[in-house]
UniProtKB/Swiss-Prot annotation:
GO biological process: conversion of seryl-tRNAsec to selenocys-tRNAsec; selenocysteine incorporation
Pfam family for this entry, one: SelA
Protein name, UniProt field: L-seryl-tRNA(Sec) selenium transferase
InterPro entries in UniProt: PyrdxlP-dep_Trfase, PyrdxlP-dep_Trfase_major, SelA-like, SelA_trans, SelA_trans_N_dom
Subcellular location: Cytoplasm
Functional description taken from the UniProt entry: Converts seryl-tRNA(Sec) to selenocysteinyl-tRNA(Sec) required for selenoprotein biosynthesis.
Organism: Pseudomonas paraeruginosa (strain DSM 24068 / PA7)
Pathway where this protein functions: Aminoacyl-tRNA biosynthesis; selenocysteinyl-tRNA(Sec) biosynthesis; selenocysteinyl-tRNA(Sec) from L-seryl-tRNA(Sec) (bacterial route): step 1/1
Cofactor(s) needed by this chain: pyridoxal 5'-phosphate
HAMAP family: SelA
Length: 468
């Protein structure tokens, strides 16, 4: 094959085939892509390894368009979370209700009174946007908000216990992942760790014996991401608060996931509420916004007015504060808690957590034939009972009755590993990636969180091509 002459960059830029790319991506991006493409093709063209059709304006514009589309594709992708873990940290945790999404849109589009008092016309405090709601819902005297619960714990410890001892049970020195360990956070906050008791048993007398002139605070951490069972003992919040207050010390309680309602009302496992912690005497309570609360990522610090005031004056507070979008979403979510009778209908996280297993199984029965057709005869598709998890460290032992599509290759067990990994990759490669979980030589798609059934069903035919 003889050599073929490459078209010039200028000619391609002015071609009708490239016009839509120019309009969509701009001249600079298109120019750079065309230059790179032509540089790659120059030697093969000189050697005669390319046909003339491969260097036509239409073909080259098409290849440039593919590259530009890949370069400009958003790194943030919507996915189907079919892992069975509702509050999946790697998949974004809580899904926001429509009220919060509308509030974010409003805050993003228009100026708002973020730190402006409309009554006085003077500078305001951004925490005031949710203070009234928090007081109404929890009875707390004051509140401040930072960007996550790790920041809330760090800020509270640094503000109330710097250069002093923080007394905590040895059984509560937790790690929640991502290098967040309570002992390390206390050290970073300038608090000297004074651990008491043992891993499985800590008594009131252990705290009493530890309190001295260097004590700054007592700390209690809800061990939400693991469970110690058997021969155990711990000191309830009310008793611990009495000990702390008897010595003039504050009690800081970190609830981790945190909730404002009794979840047993919806058939879910019991989790300590913020109101209970405050009623039992905790001076400061910290918890997450994007876990059981069902809101945006945030760390809430609430409790005693004087102590919250000290926390708000800490210079670190400005470095950790939340923006207008977070506050707008948080206010909208908190507002839903005013009507607990309709909370499961309106709060997306609670609706998904409390979704009946019989409803999930019915959905699985509807989808099984379509998935079996898409995968072909080499796969067994079965509707099975499943046990999901709340996730994000909440109730690690508890399981949520659910249903799943269990996908198992019809081949010897020793060969299934690669086949299952190929299916995982194919599902992740769909326009709306599907994330399941591997278990017992099968790929499980737990449907508890499958809200958009039509979109899921519509892309199933693509699987056959992805797997071939």
């Amino acid at each position: 094959m003889s050599s073929v002459r490459l078209p010039s960059v200028d000619r391609l830029l002015r071609s009708a085939a490239a016009a839509p790319l120019h309009q969509r991506y701009g001249r600079e991006a298109l120019l750079a892509t065309l230059r790179d493409l032509l540089d790659e093709l120059r030697e093969p063209a000189r050697q005669g390894a390319l046909a003339a059709i491969e260097l036509s304006e239409a073909v080259l514009a098409g290849r440039a368009g593919e590259r530009l589309a890949a370069q400009h594709a958003s790194r943030v992708r919507r996915v189907f979370n079919l892992t069975g873990t509702v509050l999946h940290t790697n998949l974004g945790r809580a899904l926001l209700p429509e009220e919060a999404i509308e509030a974010i849109t409003l805050a993003a589009r228009y100026p708002l009174n973020l730190e402006f008092d409309l009554a006085s016309g003077k500078r305001g405090d951004r925490d005031d946007l949710i203070t009234g709601l928090i007081r109404e819902l929890t009875g707390a005297e004051a509140v401040t908000v930072v960007n996550n619960n790790a920041a809330a714990v760090l800020l509270a410890l640094n503000s109330l216990g710097a250069r002093k001892e923080g007394i905590i049970s040895r059984g509560e020195l937790i790690e929640i992942g991502g290098a967040f360990r309570i002992p390390d956070i206390m050290t970073r906050a300038g608090v000297r760790l004074h651990e008491v008791g043992t891993t499985n048993r800590t008594h009131a007398r252990d705290y009493e014996a530890a309190i001295g002139p260097r004590s700054g605070l007592l700390m209690r951490v809800h061990t939400s991401n693991y469970s110690v069972q058997g021969f155990t003992a711990s000191v309830p919040t009310a008793q611990l608060a009495a000990i702390a207050h008897g010595h003039g010390l504050p009690l800081l309680e970190d609830l981790g996931s945190g909730t404002l309602v009794d979840l047993t009302r919806w058939g879910l496992p019991k989790e300590p509420t913020v109101q209970e912690a405050l009623a039992d005497g905790a001076d400061i309570v910290t918890f997450s916004g994007d876990k059981l609360l069902g809101g945006p990522q945030a760390g809430l610090i609430l409790g005693n007015r004087e102590l919250v005031g000290r926390i708000k004056k800490n210079p670190l507070k400005r470095a950790l504060r939340v923006d207008k979008l977070t506050l707008a979403a948080l206010e909208a979510v908190l507002g839903l808690y005013r009507d607990p009778d309709r909370l499961a209908e309106r709060l997306t996280t609670l609706r998904l957590l409390s979704r009946p297993a019989v409803e999930i199984r019915a959905q699985a029965e509807r989808l099984a034939p379509a998935l079996a057709e898409a995968l072909g005869e080499d796969w067994e598709v079965a509707v099975v009972d499943a046990l999901g998890m709340i996730g994000s460290g909440a109730q690690p032992v508890a399981r949520l009755a659910s249903a799943a599509l269990c996908l198992r290759p019809r081949q010897p067990r020793r060969l299934r590993g690669r086949t299952l990994r190929n299916l995982e990759e194919a599902l992740r490669g769909l326009p709306l990636p599907v994330i399941g979980r591997l278990d017992d030589d099968a790929l499980w798609l737990d449907l508890r969180q499958l809200d958009d059934e039509p979109a899921f069903r519509a892309q199933l035919p693509r699987l056959r091509g992805e797997l071939s």
